[in-house]
Amino acid sequence: MKVFVLNGPNLGRLGKREPA
């Protein structure tokens, strides 16, 4: 859930876990 919030700046790292 929180990964979605950081999906912007951390799209490379958290984007792989939660491509929301």
From Swiss-Prot:
It catalyses: 3-dehydroquinate = 3-dehydroshikimate + H2O. Keywords: Amino-acid biosynthesis, Aromatic amino acid biosynthesis, Lyase, Quinate metabolism. Its EC number is 4.2.1.10. InterPro entries: DHquinase_II_sf. Optimum pH is 9.0. One of its GO terms (biological process) is quinate metabolic process. Optimum temperature is 76 degrees Celsius. Thermostable. Catalyzes a trans-dehydration via an enolate intermediate. Is involved in both the catabolism of quinate and the biosynthesis of aromatic amino acids. Belongs to the type-II 3-dehydroquinase family. Homododecamer. This is 3-dehydroquinate dehydratase. It comes from Amycolatopsis methanolica.
